[in-house]
């Protein structure tokens, strides 16, 4: 029987063999056609060696091509070849045996449709389309049962996330990072099917809702990244079942709440943990700090309490510890860093106390040491002098005592040393001359004594030097004039004596020079007038002799007050009641008398002529009388100038007429004034005291407070902060002279229809405003809080670059009782942070909230308070009701803007939502906002910065460490 059927088996085998050969032959014949299609539609040097028209060509030798034994293509890897153009459709119709398709890091046409045919590749195991920047919807992957690797990161996919992926049970690597244009979607319970998955990378891809408990079934996971999404609720304790996990990234999910699960401490292979910028509460589990392989622990910007577990000090692997902006108490582990290769430590803005850890840089690798704004006590350990790798050393605003170690001041790579606001004593170490890379040195408000060492001049990269409010004595070293990059020199509030060195005139980059409240004697060097721009304060010293004429004409006379032996030189052409005229030698007096007679005669003749003209021009008498009034009122003004600008103060006063009014605001009336030089300035006449019966003493107090604020504003130098030229003050009126902004303010541009701002311009405005506020918050000490961020206080120059205006003025005007558009506090309804409305206490996070409202204005085109939001609604509440669906998100966007901008606008909206969180600690800092907005730069826009890496590597640290503590 078997022999009888044998011929049929032979025939069947022969048929199948020939069929396979025929199929292979047919497929092999189709392959050249697809290579020709690729050659014709893709462009790049890498394909120049593809000779597709030669009949004898072996395609298997082409770049990126691999074949099996029958010559059938199995791998097509064109990654990183800088190709452009269109990838042809139907790749698997031509390559049916294809196992690997990698097209990552190319510049393919965004509208390419080839992706829709990919599910036909039933044998495909590895699909990589990362950083191709494709658009459109994603296909159904359910038929691709062989798929092991899928990487669709850094694209612009829209529509629904393909949940069918979670049925591909052989999947090992899943990456959809940075797809912010997808619809909001929730991680399904079916994720538990992916038991072979080692990498789940779903950062910034519109995930929302809770993290499912079933995620605990993915026991093969090595890397779990869900950062930058809208996840909410508590972190499930089942994550503690992921025994192979090495990296856990959940940061920037600001609706995550609850405590950190103790069970995470079960993950003995875990190396990196980042759950920053969320709403976590409770303490840091000891079990986490005891993990044997922990390298990175970042939990900053939460509401964590309690002490830092002592077990963290025993770690042998810890490199980066970032816990800033929490409510942590107690002491740092005393042995922190003694056994581990620490690179960065930032525990700033907590309530930590006790001594600083002595051996934190024992490994010799520490780059960043930041412990600002805590309650640390004791001295700075001598061992810190051996931290030769340090780049930033910031211990400001603590309770440190003792002397400054020589070694700390001679660190060869350090760029910032910040010791301000402590109780440090002793001299400035001479070793400061060895800090060749030092750019910023802050030592203000300590008890430092001795002299300023001349070795300081060796630190030629210094840009900022603040030694104010100490007990320094002796002369100002002439060698300071060698610090040619210096733009801030503050020595105020010491016991410095001798004369002001002429060499200071070499500091051509200087913006701020404050030598006030010392014991300086002698004359003021005439050549100091060469410093441009100038903000000078020499008040409260023992200076004598004439004030340089150029400084008088620059309106800087007030900067020399409380120097009773100073005088006004006759050549100044005017006198100031605060200073006497300088006495002239006898010979010059006689000559002066002759000149006085000649001038008197000239004035008499001129008076006769004027009288005649007035008789003939009686119709202009009212105007002339007004001029006389202005002229007389001029002498009642105090004038303070902050920049060199050529104008006669009388010009300003004469131009304050109705026809020059360009706007009214909560703080006053704004005039456009064209000077004789042709330059145009803006003059803001601040609202005067509303209570006319107020005591003169009260008025003087308020004016003094305003003057203090204005002098601070006048010292500011930043491209996104409006330049304040001058300030006029009297008991009844205050004038601010600003640079003129020809395109008005942002409110008018957005809401009055004067101009159409495309998204790219709006984004530019948002970044500029954020950079200006970041400067006020993070680059000044102490920080300046604006208190009244709103679109009317954002001015636009000729190129629509934004300039922040009116910062610091609001709180003084509130005391005057006249700011009609503000609430009881400084600030404007619709822009006020919720906690400010309750507590009346302004913080930098209040400014962040107000900026978030402005950003929403830019994105939606709507006003902060509008009837379209319904009863008791504002723009923040309205947006919060729309973000649960993709349709809702689209509905919030300004309909006047092009469809192509929607994705970029949604990216920016995510930033605005973070800024307007009701919990202040959840809001990012303005430095972080700048980075977030730069990351959201419209496609094709300027390359403002490189993309941040999504993981912490050995060679880098968090954005906060590298960018925000400046």
From Swiss-Prot:
Q: Give the way it sits in the membrane.
A: Single-pass membrane protein
Q: Which GO terms describe its cellular component?
A: plasma membrane
Please indicate the ranges of residues that lie on the Cytoplasmic side: 614-966
Q: Which GO terms describe its biological process?
A: floral organ development; lateral root formation; nitrate import; positive regulation of lateral root development; regulation of anthocyanin biosynthetic process; regulation of lateral root development; regulation of lignin biosynthetic process; regulation of root development
Catalysed conversion reaction? L-tyrosyl-[protein] + ATP = O-phospho-L-tyrosyl-[protein] + ADP + H(+)
* Stretch forming the signal peptide: 1-22
UniProt region (Disordered), positions on chain: 937-966
Q: Which UniProt keywords apply?
A: ATP-binding, Cell membrane, Developmental protein, Glycoprotein, Kinase, Leucine-rich repeat, Membrane, Nucleotide-binding, Phosphoprotein, Receptor, Repeat, Serine/threonine-protein kinase, Signal, Transferase, Transmembrane, Transmembrane helix
Instruction: Give residue numbers for the modification (Phosphotyrosine).
Output: 738, 775, 831, 838
Q: What glycosylation sites does the entry record?
A: 61, 109, 120, 128, 167, 217, 241, 269, 301, 437, 527, 537
Active site at: 788
User: Binding residues for ATP, per the UniProt record?
Assistant: 662-670, 684
Molecular-function GO term, any one: protein serine/threonine kinase activity
Annotated LRR repeats reside at: 70-94, 95-120, 122-144, 145-168, 170-194, 195-218, 219-242, 245-267, 268-291, 292-315, 317-339, 341-363, 365-386, 387-411, 412-435, 437-459, 460-483, 484-507, 508-531, 533-554
The protein's Enzyme Commission number = 2.7.10.1
Per the database record, which ranges form the Protein kinase domain? 656-934
Tell me the enzyme class.
transferase
Transmembrane stretches in the record are: 593-613
Q: Where does the UniProt annotation locate this protein?
A: Cell membrane
Q: What does this protein do?
A: Receptor kinase involved in the perception of C-terminally encoded plant signaling peptide (CEP) and subsequent regulation of root and shoot development. Required for xylem and phloem cell files morphology and organization, probably by preventing ectopic lignification in phloem cells. Together with CEPR2, mediates systemic nitrogen (N)-demand signaling upon the perception of root-derived peptides (e.g. CEP1) via the up-regulation of genes involved in N uptake and assimilation pathways.
Subunit composition? Interacts with the root-derived peptides CEP1, CEP3 and CEP5.
The family note in this entry says: Belongs to the protein kinase superfamily. Ser/Thr protein kinase family.
Name under which the protein is recorded: Receptor protein-tyrosine kinase CEPR1
Where does this protein come from, organism-wise?
Answer: Arabidopsis thaliana
Q: Read off the lineage from the record.
A: Eukaryota, Viridiplantae, Streptophyta, Embryophyta, Tracheophyta
């Amino acid at each position: 029987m078997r022999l009888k059927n044998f011929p049929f088996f032979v025939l069947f085998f022969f048929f199948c063999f020939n069929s396979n050969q025929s199929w292979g032959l047919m497929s092999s014949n189709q392959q050249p056609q697809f290579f020709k299609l690729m050659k014709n539609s893709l462009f790049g040097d890498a394909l120049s060696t593809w000779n597709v028209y030669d009949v004898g060509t072996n395609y298997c030798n082409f770049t990126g091509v691999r074949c099996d034994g029958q010559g059938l293509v199995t791998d097509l890897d064109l990654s990183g070849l800088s190709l452009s153009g269109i990838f042809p459709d139907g790749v698997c119709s031509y390559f049916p045996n294809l196992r690997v398709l990698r097209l990552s890091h190319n510049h393919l046409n965004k509208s390419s449709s080839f992706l829709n045919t990919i599910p036909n590749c039933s044998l495909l195991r590895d699909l990589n389309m990362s950083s191709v920047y494709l658009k459109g919807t994603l296909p159904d992957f359910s038929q691709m049962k062989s798929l092991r690797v899928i990487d669709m990161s850094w694209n612009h996919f829209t529509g629904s996330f393909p949940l069918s992926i979670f049925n591909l049970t052989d999947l090992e690597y899943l990456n959809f990072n940075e797809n912010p244009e997808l619809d909001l979607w929730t991680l399904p319970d079916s994720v538990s099917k992916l038991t072979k998955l080692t990498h789940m990378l779903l950062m910034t891809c519109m995930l929302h809702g809770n993290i499912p408990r079933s995620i605990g079934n993915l026991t093969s996971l090595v890397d779990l990244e869900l950062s930058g999404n809208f996840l909410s609720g508590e972190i499930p304790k089942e994550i503690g079942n992921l025994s192979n996990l090495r990296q856990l990234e959940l940061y920037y999910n600001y609706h995550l709440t609850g405590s950190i699960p103790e069970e995470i401490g079960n993950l003995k292979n875990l190396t990196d943990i980042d759950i920053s910028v969320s709403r976590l509460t409770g303490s840091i589990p000891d079990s986490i700090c005891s993990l044997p392989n922990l390298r990175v622990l970042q939990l900053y910007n939460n509401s964590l309490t309690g002490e830092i577990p002592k077990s963290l000090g025993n770690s042998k692997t810890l490199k980066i510890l970032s816990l800033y902006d929490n409510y942590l108490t107690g002491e740092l582990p005393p042995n922190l860093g003694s056994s581990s290769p620490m690179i960065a430590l930032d525990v700033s803005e907590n309530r930590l106390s006790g001594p600083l850890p002595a051996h934190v840089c024992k490994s010799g690798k520490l780059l960043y040491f930041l412990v600002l704004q805590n309650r640390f006590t004791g001295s700075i350990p001598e061992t810190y002098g051996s931290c030769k790798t340090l780049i930033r050393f910031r211990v400001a605003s603590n309770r440190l005592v003792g002397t400054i170690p020589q070694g700390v001041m001679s660190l060869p790579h350090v760029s910032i040393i910040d010791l301000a606001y402590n109780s440090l004593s002793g001299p400035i170490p001479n070793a400061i001359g060895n800090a060749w890379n030092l750019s910023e040195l802050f030592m203000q408000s300590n008890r430092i004594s001795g002299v300023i060492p001349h070795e300081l001049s060796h630190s030629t990269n210094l840009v900022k030097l603040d030694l104010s409010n100490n007990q320094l004595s002796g002369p100002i070293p002439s060698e300071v004039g060698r610090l040619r990059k210096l733009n801030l020199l503050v020595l105020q509030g010491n016991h410095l004596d001798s004369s002001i060195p002429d060499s200071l005139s070499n500091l051509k980059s200087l913006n701020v020079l404050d030598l006030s409240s010392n014991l300086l004697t002698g004359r003021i060097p005439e050549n100091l007038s060469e410093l441009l721009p100038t903000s000078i304060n020499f008040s409260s010293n023992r200076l004598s002799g004439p004030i340089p004429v150029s400084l008088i004409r620059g309106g800087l006379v007030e900067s020399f007050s409380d120097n009773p032996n100073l005088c006004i030189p006759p050549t100044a052409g005017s006198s100031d009641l605060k200073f006497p005229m300088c006495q002239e030698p006898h010979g010059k007096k006689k000559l002066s008398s002759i000149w006085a007679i000649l001038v008197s005669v000239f004035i008499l003749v001129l008076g006769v002529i004027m009288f005649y003209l007035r008789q003939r021009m009686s119709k202009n008498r009212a105007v002339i009388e007004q001029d006389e009034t202005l002229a007389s009122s001029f002498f009642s003004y105090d004038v303070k100038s902050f920049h060199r600008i050529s104008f006669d103060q009388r010009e300003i006063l004469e131009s304050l007429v109705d026809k020059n009014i360009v706007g009214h605001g909560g703080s006053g009336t704004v005039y456009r004034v064209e000077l004789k030089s042709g330059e145009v300035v803006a003059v803001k006449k601040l609202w005067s005291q509303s209570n006319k019966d107020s005591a003169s003493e009260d008025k003087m107090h308020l004016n003094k407070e305003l003057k203090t604020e204005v002098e601070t504003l006048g010292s500011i130098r930043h491209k996104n902060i409006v330049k304040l030229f001058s300030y006029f003050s009297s008991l009844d009126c205050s004038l601010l002279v600003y640079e003129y902004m020809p395109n008005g303010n942002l409110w008018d541009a957005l809401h009055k229809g004067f101009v159409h701002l495309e998204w790219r311009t709006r984004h530019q405005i948002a970044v500029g405003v954020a950079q200006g506020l970041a400067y006020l918050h993070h680059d000044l000490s102490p920080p300046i809080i604006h208190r009244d961020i709103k679109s009317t206080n954002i001015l636009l120059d000729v190129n629509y670059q934004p300039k922040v205006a009116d910062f610091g003025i609001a709180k003084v005007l509130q005391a005057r009782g006249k700011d009609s558009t503000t609430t009881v506090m400084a600030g404007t309804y619709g822009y006020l942070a919720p906690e400010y409305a309750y507590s009346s206490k302004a913080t930098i996070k209040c400014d962040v909230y107000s900026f978030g409202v402005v950003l929403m204005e830019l994105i939606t085109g709507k006003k902060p308070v509008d009837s379209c939001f319904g009863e008791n609604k504002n723009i923040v509440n309205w947006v919060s009701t729309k973000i649960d669906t993709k349709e809702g998100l689209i509905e919030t966007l300004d309909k006047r803007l092009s469809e192509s901008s929607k994705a970029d606008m949604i990216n920016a909206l995510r930033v605005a939502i973070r800024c307007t969180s009701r919990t202040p600690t959840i809001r990012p800092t303005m430095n972080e906002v700048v980075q977030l907005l730069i990351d959201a730069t419209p496609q094709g826009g300027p390359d403002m910065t490189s993309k941040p890496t999504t993981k912490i590597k050995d060679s880098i640290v968090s954005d906060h460490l590298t960018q925000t503590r400046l």
